[in-house]
Design a protein with these regions (language model features):
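Rossmann-like adenosine-cofactor binding region
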Residues: 236, 267-348
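Predominant activation on well-ordered alpha-helical scaffold segments within soluble catalytic domains
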Residues: 114-121, 156-163, 167, 186-190, ...
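Adenosine-phosphate binding glycine-rich loop
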Residues: 225, 316-410
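Glycine-rich phosphate/diphosphate-binding loop of Rossmann-like nucleotide-binding domains
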Residues: 208-293
Length: 410
């Protein structure tokens, strides 16, 4: 976060209206940080002028040069309808058809979107293997230039283009919703390929997996509490939730209903109303990790656990739904050195893929699915025990668990 604020006439910027705020893309004045920040405008004033808080990302996006390339195949294409760059990365199909969501997000360069697809698809290989699924790892990412706001027609074109790209791979990869997409958008993808899941129930699909993802995180939280305090009871425990989207919002409601003390935040200031409804304390995004609490629960975008954040963490443990929480692999050792217990994200947030995989089967049984998602907590407990007994980090323990399944197929 940088101490910059400025006033712009709304006619000079690209804006998207949100309930109590604006998302604004504008030219940064000379002397501002060189990398493009994310800007949140708030307190709309008269005569179309807003005051903006400028939030500077603390770490750069992963670049192609820093991503280990161990992937089976990567398809990079330009959508014939949308003109957008689409990257579909298949990291591994050793355990079965690769499964991973479709992300549509703003990046400075199209190569950043490709790098994200490589990073995220590799994480999906670990996630699906650790979850015990007969699925490989893949991910698709659609690059939106910074400041781009798509119309409904343009979103439809992008989804049709994504469907064409996936279909061209011949069934090695199946997609689903992710950040920037939805179950309804997956129904559009399905017009061009059968290799998509998580469509709305009224379109013959199994719906969004957010409930299952939140349930898996909740089970992981209970296991983490037991490791710390000898009790899984969340009542009276203090949680800091960063990100109140589909999963974070559901999780916050679950914890509040169970009697937890909550401190919450989100980049969307309209979420303050939701926080008030829960009886939660609101804190600024940049300060959330410093709050003294039992657990820090990141549920937004990845890369949140930077060296600086780890050094400033005020919680005894980190358990959250966000993907790729560690800004770098060594972050697991830094957390361990500080005595902070970290539940590896690709294990914790596997409830969604478990649901999509099992609910898509002809013999799907919701009770069986719920029971399977609940076992995520048992997996987290095993990871904690293995890490302690072997003197390794929880990340290494989780990677060993996933590798054991992958190696068994060789």
């Amino acid at each position: 976060r940088v101490a910059l604020s400025a006033e712009f006439d709304l006619n000079d910027v690209v804006t998207e209206m949100l309930p109590n705020s604006y998302t604004v893309a504008a030219r940064i004045p000379e002397g501002a940080p060189q990398s493009r920040p994310i800007m949140r405008a708030h307190k709309a004033r008269e005569q179309g002028v807003v005051t903006m808080t400028i939030v500077q990302p603390s770490t750069p996006l992963a670049s192609l040069a820093t991503i280990p390339f161990t992937h089976e195949r990567v398809l990079i294409s330009t959508g014939s309808r949308s003109g957008l760059t689409i990257s579909v990365a298949v990291h591994s199909s050793r355990l079965g058809q690769a499964l991973g969501g479709a992300r549509m997000w703003q990046y400075e360069n199209w190569t950043d979107a490709v790098a994200d697809s490589l990073r995220l698809s590799a994480a999906m290989t670990l996630k699906n293997a650790a979850a015990g699924l007969n699925r490989g790892g893949g991910k698709s990412v659609i690059h939106l230039p910074i400041g781009t706001v798509l119309t409904d027609a343009q979103k439809r074109d992008a989804m049709l283009d994504l469907g064409d790209a996936i279909e061209s791979l011949g069934g090695v990869y199946m997609t689903a919703e992710d950040v920037g997409t939805s179950a309804e958008m997956m129904a559009i993808v399905a017009e061009r390929t059968d290799h998509v899941c998580g469509l709305p129930a009224d379109r013959g699909g199994v719906g969004e997996p957010a409930d299952a993802t939140a349930a898996g995180v909740y089970a992981s939280i209970r296991s983490t509490l037991f490791a710390l305090f000898g009790s899984e009871d969340v009542a009276g425990r203090h949680f800091v939730i960063s990100g109140l989207g589909q999963v974070g919002g559901r999780l916050a409601s679950m914890l509040a209903s169970a009697g937890a003390e909550l401190t919450v935040t989100d980049v969307n200031l309209a979420k303050k109303d939701f926080a008030l409804l829960l009886g939660a304390r609101w804190v600024d995004v940049a300060d959330a990790h410093r709050v003294r609490a039992d657990l820090f629960v990141p549920c937004g975008l990845g890369g949140v656990l930077t060296d600086q954040v780890i050094g400033e963490l005020g919680s005894r443990a980190v358990v959250g739904a966000a993907n790729n929480q560690l800004a770098n692999h060594d972050g697991a050792r830094e957390l361990d050195a500080r005595g902070i217990l970290w539940a590896p994200d690709f294990v914790v947030n596997a409830g969604g893929v478990i649901y999509l995989d099992m609910a898509s089967r002809p013999d799907a049984d919701q009770k069986v699915i719920d029971a399977r998602v609940a076992t995520i907590g048992d997996t987290v407990t095993k990871i904690f025990e293995d890490a302690r007994e072997l003197g390794i980090t929880t990340l290494e323990a989780a990677e060993r668990l996933a590798a054991a399944r992958l190696d068994a197929t060789v």
